[in-house]
Amino acid sequence: MKLHELKAAEGSRRVRNRVGRGAATGNGKTSGRGQKGQKARSGGKVRPGFEGGQLPLFRRLPKRGFTNINRKEYAIVNLDQLNKFEDGTEVTPALLVESGVVKNEKSGIKVLGNGSLDKKLTVKAHKFSASAAEAIDAKGGAHEVI
């Protein structure tokens, strides 16, 4: 057997369906697009949300709310993620980014009380939930808002 004699396994490769190549192919003339109309034309499609001229849902529903331009989004760190640091470490936002616990600092770091903390740490962050602050202090550590 030589390289030019290699053949793909039977049924492993599907033949591309060529449309508009004569009536005998079963896909000639209209090429599977049916008769006239918008979807039969080249480039003919309706935009997402178009309902055939009926007032679309996104226009029937009232406008609501606004986007606060001063909104702050905090990167979230849970207590169980802080266990990866050594006992007595001072955990800062820079250390969290460097160690890969947080990918993007965003508007700051917020520590939440999910999971349990096993180590005594000094944690510096922009915000703390009440349960997180309580858990850090209970282990003999300290929390500091920066």
Curated annotation (Swiss-Prot):
Biased composition (Gly residues): 23-35
Pfam families cross-referenced by the UniProt entry: Ribosomal_L27A
Keywords: Ribonucleoprotein, Ribosomal protein, RNA-binding, rRNA-binding
Xref: PROSITE patterns: RIBOSOMAL_L15
Keyword Ligase: no
Biological process per Gene Ontology, one example term: translation
UniProt-annotated stretches for the region Disordered: 1-56
SUPFAM superfamilies for this protein: Ribosomal proteins L15p and L18e
GO molecular function: rRNA binding; structural constituent of ribosome
A Gene Ontology term for the protein's cellular component: cytosolic large ribosomal subunit
Composition bias type Basic and acidic residues, residue spans: 1-13
Subunit composition and interactions: Part of the 50S ribosomal subunit.
Family: Belongs to the universal ribosomal protein uL15 family.
Function: Binds to the 23S rRNA.
Name by which UniProt lists this protein: Large ribosomal subunit protein uL15
